[in-house]
Amino acid sequence: MQVDLLGSAQSAHALHLFHQHSPLVHCMTNDVVQTFTANTLLALGASPAMVIETEEASQFAAIASALLINVGTLTQPRAQAMRAAVEQAKSSQTPWTLDPVAVGALDYRRHFCHELLSFKPAAIRGNASEIMALAGIANGGRGVDTTDAAANAIPAAQTLARETGAIVVVTGEMDYVTDGHRIIGIHGGDPLMTKVVGTGCALSAVVAACCALPGDTLENVASACHWMKQAGERAVARSEGPGSFVPHFLDALWQLTQEVQA
């Protein structure tokens, strides 16, 4: 199994494209992370919109550049709105990304996520336990936290990618991104990033945005992981803990975009 590393030139090119296209991202995400997710997208140059009402979700999915479905705080009304948005996204050819939060721990969301897979997501982003559970290999995880190493989920990610046609992202100490054939590994980040709610969920929104960019979607999605890890490292170097990490992280994302435009 060959894992290729993402080059810095590829990442910089993708970030330039990101800022140039400024994707409009329809984020149907969980209640805990909405502000952080929106600010992450804004710092990178995207335009976030948090439209969740069923009557509006379908309409907005048709005009957005990309759609994110995050099941972190799933309810039946929210599932109805998400289903409507995904159906419209497929009809309108809007690329959509699934973040199957805690899919291995709870039956309702597992069944719902499996139902959504039939609408062919452009990308799926989760931790190792979530990806393995979604692929039907294991039902692990400790709530929203993983109990498996990212590398152990690569076979499940490849299977899921081949079955759905999605780019699958497994996040951890090292991130792995695959289309079922190629695998790209991304080093970096810091353990402190796991002590702040929303870093993974925000990454899923950035992944969704990257699916709307021209060029190699696998490399564009891998670049999203690289930007987040780079910004995390910079933020940790300047912060004293989780509380001061967040503003430094957003600043670091912004600075990355300024550097590729210089």
UniProtKB/Swiss-Prot annotation:
GO annotations of cellular component type: cytosol
Binding of ATP, residues: 125, 171
Binding site for substrate: 50, 198
GO molecular function ontology, one term from the record: prenol kinase activity
Cofactor(s) needed for function: Mg(2+)
EC number: 2.7.1.50
Catalysed reaction equations from the record: 5-(2-hydroxyethyl)-4-methylthiazole + ATP = 4-methyl-5-(2-phosphooxyethyl)-thiazole + ADP + H(+)
Keyword Calcium in record: no
GO BP terms in the entry: thiamine diphosphate biosynthetic process; thiamine salvage
Transmembrane regions listed in the UniProt entry: none
InterPro entries: Hyethyz_kinase, Ribokinase-like
A family per Pfam: HK
Record's keyword terms, sorted: ATP-binding, Kinase, Magnesium, Metal-binding, Nucleotide-binding, Thiamine biosynthesis, Transferase
Pathway: Cofactor biosynthesis; thiamine diphosphate biosynthesis; 4-methyl-5-(2-phosphoethyl)-thiazole from 5-(2-hydroxyethyl)-4-methylthiazole: step 1/1
Family stated for the protein in its record: Belongs to the Thz kinase family.
Task of the protein: Catalyzes the phosphorylation of the hydroxyl group of 4-methyl-5-beta-hydroxyethylthiazole (THZ).
NCBIfam families the UniProt entry points to: PRK09355.1 (NF006830), thiM (TIGR00694)
Protein name: Hydroxyethylthiazole kinase
Organism per entry: Escherichia coli (strain K12)
Top-level taxonomy: Bacteria, Pseudomonadati, Pseudomonadota, Gammaproteobacteria, Enterobacterales
